Every structure is written in structure tokens, then in C-alpha cells.
Amino acid sequence: MFVLAGFAGTGKSTILPDIMNELGLTVADIAFCAPTGKAAKVMGEKLRAQGFTNAYPSTVHSLIYQPKMQKAEVLEKQLEEAKTQWMALKTGAADPPPANLRMELKEQERKIHILEKDLDRAYTMDDLRFSLNPDSKLITDDKKIIILDEASMVGVEMAEDLASFEIPVLAIGDPGQLPPVGDEPGFLSGTPDFFLTEIHRQAAENPIIRLATMVRKGERGDYGDYGGGVMIIRPKQDEFSLDLARDAQIICGTNKRRWQLTSKIRKAAGFGGLTAPQAGEPLIMCKNSKIHPALVNGTSIFSASDHDDLEEGSARFILDIKDEEGAAKRLFTYQGLFEEHLKREKNWSSASKQAAFKSRITDHSVDFGWAITCHKSQGSQWDEVIVHDESWVFKEAADQWLYTAITRAAERLIIVAPE
């Protein structure tokens, strides 16, 4: 396992082709991946811009996990079959004999190792929502290396799961960003193998990178116009958050602020008083879909139609959406996340506790996407971002929070800073 770390503007992405060439690797040899669908999409766009036309990264989940729960008894059977196959290969009893015995033995040993790890998890966890996939394309496509982007978002367990495939991992990440939610960093907790520290001259001239670097060093910028569409303004100057023509992504720190902003923006858009998503409204996936692989946690989608108001007492409703590629889909959706905006209360649902629990487990989790928290924004990037600075809420992680929020902007940035 090799960790390549670097702050914004140090060239983590631009150095990747040189690493591939130095190792003599082609795109076909590499499993490119990232923690979220949006991060994987951004990684792919950067790779293809560098000439790697066939580079289409996947999420870590789709790369190494199976979408359905495997119960302990199923895993036990699979493990027994894998061990029997290994013994047949080892003793020469396999029929027909393999063309490459050494390679077949190695592949079978990998499968046994993965199944043993997954079975151990099944025995010790009450709610196993996914399992490692012993038939991952890492094995079936004979990948030589895993290249993981946005490694700061990966926790200890996922890092261990990646390592269990016994394929070299190159993890690339920014230690200035927030650690994974509810977990310790899996790759960036210690000293990286290589640390890019020098900011490229072109990047150093970018006001977004300048502000990000200041924040990372514990400094804060003054109110004013920094050029290139980058500003720091007072809350009373904020006429931008409600300017729907700007097509900016709003990032804040708390659900309370997110609910307030969403209410104001929906009212400005003409949707005030309407409880359900209306045609064209931005939405965001809040957990991975079990049906549509492309709809992973953090994916931006849009409402495809005007939906009737949410029915009080119901746990679910049918949501028509369009994904990032414009494809239409109909989703059974947990409506509690939308009802939270009405009550301004986390985990609130008008349905019975039993019905709400069942819908949260089985249905899609979607929320309004006008304003999102910084944690939800990790791994994504937008041309224009408006940051409502609530970094003070995060105490010791205040600098990491604001640094992460700032670096979500690719071209234009407005920071609404407290007085």
C-alpha cells in the first residue's frame, strides 16, 4: 500500500500519468476508484482529459462489495466450496486441469481470504448490509493495481477491505480535508509515503487555492473581492444564495442552516408551501441505491415532475427523477427526509416508527439538494460554490471544514462569513 498525499494545487492529479508510465501500466491494468459516484466521475474526467480515453473509475462499493447481504450460512457454503476447489487444484484432482496452475491457486487463495474476512464480519455484526465480492473485477480482470482518489474520505474498515484483495493500492488524498464521517482515516492517519508540498505556480495564482492555503494554515481572509469571481461577504450582503440564475451549489455546516436556506430558496423559486419536489428541483442521494448502481450516496439528481404534496402519515412516496446523464427513473422513496424540512427536526417522520424504519431500510433516501452540508459535498466539485461559513461549529476541525468547503469550487467562490 502506497499513500500519495498533497494539498490543493500541488498536482496530485497531474503526476498520475507519470507514475503509470514509470510502472509500465496501461489503463487495462488499473482499477481506478473513488469513495463516491461524484468523486469517481470527477476522477474519470481528469484522466480522460490527460489522454486516458478508456479510464472510467468506479466507486469503491461497486468495485469490491456485493450489493446484497450474504448471510453467514451462505458464506459458509461458499467458503467450503472455495476450499474444496483449492484442494482439488493443489492435489491435481481438478477436472479439467487448469492451463496455469499457479495463477489459479493464487486466485482461489484470494477468494478464500475474502470469504473468511466476510464470514468473520457476518458473525460479529448484527446488521450486515453488504459483503465483499469474491468475484470482483479486481480478480476476474486480473488488475495489477488499485488507484484510489479522494482517500481522505476512506475509513479504516474500507481500507482494510481494499487491502484484503492482496492487490497493491495507490491511495491519493488531501490530508487537509475532513476525515471520514464517524470513522478514523484509513489511509491518511499517519505519515504518507510521499507528500507533495509545493503549490504549482499557476495554481498559486488562483484565488480559490490562495484562500484554501490560508485557511489550512489557520488564517482567515478579510471581506472583499479577491478577483476571478471569488469573494468573502457579510451575511447582510448575501444576495447570491437566492439568485437561481447563478446555478451555484450552496454548502453549509449544519442541518438547521440547511433547512433554513432550502426554505428560502424554494420560496424564491415559487415552491413555497409545496412539501414535495417539483419539476427541475435539485435533489441529492443520501444513501446508495440497491437497484440503480449509478445512484450512490452524494449523487446529484433532479426532480422530473411536479409531485403532489406529501401525504401525512405515509412513510414513502413515488419520486420521478432524472439522473446526471438525463435518464429518467422512478424511485420508491422514504419521505421522512423531506418532512424534516417542515418540522426542522432530524429523524422526524409523520409515519409510525415501524413504517418509517422499514422505509428507511428498503426505499431510496433522497433529499433536497439546493443546500448541502460540507460532509455531503466531499468528493464533489462544482463550477460555482457559495459557502455559508459555519466552521466555528466544528471546533478543532474548523480549518479542515472550511478548507474542504472552499476546495469544492472549481471556478467561482463566494464565502458568506460571520461577522
Residue ranges of predicted features:
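ASCE P-loop NTPase helicase motor core
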Residues: 2-77, 81-84, 99-228
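Catalytic phosphate/metal-binding cores of nucleic-acid and nucleotide-processing enzymes, i.e., regions
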Residues: 4, 70, 92, 135-139, ...
